[in-house]
Amino acid sequence: MDSQLNQARKLKTKALLIFLLFLSGCAMIPVRSYDETVSRWKTHKDLEKWMAKDFSFDTERFRRFEGTLPPPRTPEETFKLKSGIYIDAAIFAKATLNRIDPSYRAKIVVLLIPGGANHYVCSFKMDGRLFIMDYGTPYQSIVGVHGPFNSLEEYKLFFEKNHPTIKRVQAITYLR
């Protein structure tokens, strides 16, 4: 009986030690800040990979602010939360692309949708051509990087053709 009791105590002690080692190991995983992470990124492809792998569309935030423009999140906040909606993703992409390489000349683009539910994306230039980054939407048909385009009007046509519910954009312009 004493032998079984000793074995049970030893087993409990070992299990507790393993559990404590596991907890301390998890606590030691370094979490990089926005600044640290972006300083390691070299091209727009690094941002694309992060957006595709780590960023998610915030459905609850989208529903809460549907039809209005919510208070935009900072790039740091979007990075930390790893989620957002159209305006958050556009601001994050613009700030990040311009930090990676100012020659991208990233800008926020607004698509004016009849009925007032505007959509925001990020444009950037590469080799003199226009590209659009859009991760702030639940519609997979328009998520990602699109282009090259010769103009915003050309992207507008792409958007109208590929968006599953919006088939007419009233206007498209750069946000000032």
What are these regions (language model features)?
Residues 17-24:
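Bacterial N-terminal signal peptides
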Residues 15-16, 30:
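Intrinsically disordered low-complexity regions specifically enriched for long asparagine
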